[in-house]
């Protein structure tokens, strides 16, 4: 187990921020045609290539 480099840490932070659900106002605005975010990622099912 080594230290994370700054580049890897920034990429992990970006992936962490992207891994959110779609905002509720989008669901309301599109009359529930948009439910989730296509970029959602589960920590166990699909791994990042960092």
Swiss-Prot record:
GO terms for cellular component: ribonucleoprotein complex; ribosome. InterPro entries: Ribosomal_eL39, Ribosomal_eL39_CS, Ribosomal_eL39_dom_sf. GO terms for biological process: translation. Pfam families: Ribosomal_L39. GO terms for molecular function: structural constituent of ribosome. Keywords: Ribonucleoprotein, Ribosomal protein. HAMAP family: Ribosomal_eL39. Belongs to the eukaryotic ribosomal protein eL39 family. This is Large ribosomal subunit protein eL39. The gene is rpl39e.
């Amino acid at each position: 187990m080594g230290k994370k480099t700054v580049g890897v840490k920034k990429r992990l932070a970006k992936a962490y921020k992207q891994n959110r659900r779609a905002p509720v106002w989008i669901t309301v605005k599109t009359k529930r045609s948009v439910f989730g975010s296509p970029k959602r990622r589960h920590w166990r099912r699909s791994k990042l290539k960092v």
